[in-house]
Amino acid sequence: MPCSMSQQPNDGSGRAPVAIVRPTTSVTSGVAVTQKLVSAAVAFGNLLKGTYGPNGLDKMLYKTNGETAVTNDGAKIVAELLVKHPAAKAFVQLAESQENACGDGVTGCIIFASELMRESGVLLEKSLHPLVLVKGYQAAMEQTIAKWEENSHSVTLNDDLKLRSVALTAMTGTAIESVGEFLADLVVRAVQHVARQHDNQWVVDTESVRMAKKGTGSLSDTSLVKGIIFDKDLDLEKLPRKLTAGKVVVFSCPLEIEKTSYDAEIEISTTEQWSSFMAAEEEIIKHKAQQIIDSGAKLVFCAETVDKRIMHQLADSGICVLASIDKAGAEDVALATGALMIDHVDSIDEQTLGSFESMTVESFDSSEGLRDRLYLHVGDASGLTTIDVCGGGGTTSEEFVRGLYDALNSVAKAVESGIVSYGGGNQHITAALAVREYAESIAGRERLAI
């Protein structure tokens, strides 16, 4: 009777364990296994080949839950695939490594690795030993790196022309290529803003560049904000919608009457007692609001709720309040403005306040109705910068963001390494010529792999 895959335990006799499998199970070994792995790798490369280069086409991805995406971004395509084959899983890991290391170039990396596997399959069929094959590939890699270093050019943070060219190359073939010149300039300025020098080496934290999706207008309306953007409606109509330069305070705690950590009951027997109780509560509220007013802050961000009475009092004093933002948003405000997140009103002092240049709240129509958008401009001192991506919403804006993200990472890597090279296949051709010339000087079978 056929049974599922099982294995007898080792009885200590030294004999190999016996595997019991279904009659329909096929067992493959030797060169046949290698060819199956090669076939899977080649198939994975062919999946992305149609999206590569300036004439590459987009792919539509459809999930079982109904979500769709139209993209030619290799990292996005690979991330959405359900992969079970061992060789294909290795390629998924390769794509993840490339994305984590460079933030771009996943498609080219996968296609190149796939072609190496294709060639290795042919050579293995001709009985070339795998170790000789690996040695040949390593020799070719060394020649390639040497040639690339020879043909590379230095670049500095202020070399706008070269950095814009890097951004344009990364945008080629993407949805944002049509306004590439304009967006390349935005990307370069964003990188220059967040770049910091450490031990005579430029370090670019791309996480300090935020991408905000406006969902309206055209792609050419995209702008760079030296600060942050919040898509959130104001809680009160009378809150100021425009502020000039001033101070900002960031709270991680709620601005309301503090609740006790245990249940308590208060017995009130007269109207005078009730009036005294309400007056005391009102006094606490006024005191909290007055502390904020006295601090000189013009703008208040709170990661928790804000009592409407406090909000009204602050609004009457010309102070804008944005309440119930997520903690990550509050941390962004603190990072951008130089403020410190505080967990109690009593902690407000000059050292905890941040600074901003201007704040404006704009209202615009969207597919979800009338929306408020708060723009916090901090200026050159801002620890964050935001690219406000316009032009469509949904999958369209997501594809715009992916294209900008690739360009951003490419420019950041160029600044950090201080080296750029020609694009358009130039490096591939020069490396191929150098490797072929080097192979002619090798006499052994290793030459076949090179």
Predicted segments, located by residue:
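Core, soluble structural subunits of large cytosolic macromolecular machines
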Residues: M1-I450
